[in-house]
């Protein structure tokens, strides 16, 4: 009406200026348009900026920065903010890039410039890292100065294909009687260590590293096994204690420690296992043997879940992203035994998973069990009873390790696992206190002593030639009449007796890796004589 009245009066209607129109549109902008408005304003501010190579921070918080620009960026490329903080591009979306920060997000401000580095996350590798403690990006954190190495490898690379691999056929000895006899591990295998918190999972891994000392200070390069220990989400005091233990036992010289502790940003905890694997792969690809321990992958999965949810990726079971299986499979598939044409190197993986209340059927445990070649299941109940390592013989299995087991061990421990499983069953039944026949009593007597024989103190790994006579004595009933409280004493005295008087037999087992008929007869008479004198 107002416009018509003006027209009749011959007066032109007032025009709303474009600026006013834009202001009106912005005032009524929907939340989805806010980003494009911000982009326009940033373009206005930095008209000359090259948005292909640089960008500006739109928003930052919870360790995630959303950046406008960086049009040429690659997935998982390193970027650097003007404040000096580094990050990694994980989400490449239309109009913006989701970047996870490797430092504190308090240092990053909105509108700050971000630059491409041009390189996917890569880490230093090679023998120069042995004896060092590094962070998830390979930077030294032990105060021993910079790492002088000419080799750098991408942290995330494809696993070896099918043809370059060969089947697991060499033993990887842990020095633990319960593991080497019941769930043997071979070079190139992935053996999961799973159990509740405080059940001795890390200790099995540490003892395995300590046991490599007997070969790593020798001359035979093929027998050496270089160790990489990846600490994810652990307390700094725990990592410091581990370094101290390895130094005390002279094992740090052939080990690399990658630490992404609980106080580090989630992206670093996610990246650390890949960094450690790249370092282990250098040894594998150069015809050497390497062992990597992931302690633990549950915390890596939690860090990845945190990042994914903050990046607005859709959640799945237990709020983990849909590709959490791929996260662990692409990591563990990099452990392999290479064929002779590829140099014959190997990378053995010991991933650790922490369960809640013994629930092995949770999402992450079942994922990793299906990826690995077997698992060592540790039970809190056994641990509290003083049976350490607290390995549940019934649930623990090694799917490929038996092909790599030392022949002498296979000869003496063949029936051990089945017998211990029978003992557990009978022991549970015997609790009801019913009358037992002679054979059941015999099973209980021998089973109790065998269980004690498999116990072992921390940081005291044994060689296979020391284990074989002990397990032979236990399986064949030579210690059935020895009192339960005397089993530990028998073990110590028998081993020292063999070293003092029968060192030729031990050397022969160590050299050949098997028990000949002659040596078997010899071992039988030695054991009978020693048990007879010990009982007196």
UniProtKB/Swiss-Prot annotation:
Keyword vocabulary terms for this entry: ATP synthesis, ATP-binding, CF(1), Hydrogen ion transport, Ion transport, Membrane, Mitochondrion, Mitochondrion inner membrane, Nucleotide-binding, Transit peptide, Transport
Localization: Mitochondrion inner membrane
Chain segment of the transit peptide: 1-24
GO molecular function, one term: ADP binding
PROSITE patterns: ATPASE_ALPHA_BETA
InterPro entries recorded: ATP_synth_asu-like_sf (IPR023366), ATP_synth_asu_C (IPR000793), ATP_synth_asu_C_sf (IPR038376), ATP_synth_F1_a_nt-bd_dom (IPR033732), ATP_synth_F1_asu (IPR005294), ATPase_a/bsu_AS (IPR020003), ATPase_F1/V1/A1_a/bsu_N (IPR004100), ATPase_F1/V1/A1_a/bsu_N_sf (IPR036121)
Membrane topology summary: Peripheral membrane protein
Principal location listed in the UniProt entry: mitochondrion
PANTHER family registered for this protein in UniProt: ATP SYNTHASE SUBUNIT ALPHA, MITOCHONDRIAL
Similarity comment: family membership: Belongs to the ATPase alpha/beta chains family.
Protein name (record): ATP synthase subunit alpha, mitochondrial
Organism in which the protein naturally occurs: Yarrowia lipolytica (strain CLIB 122 / E 150) (Yeast)
Gene: ATP1
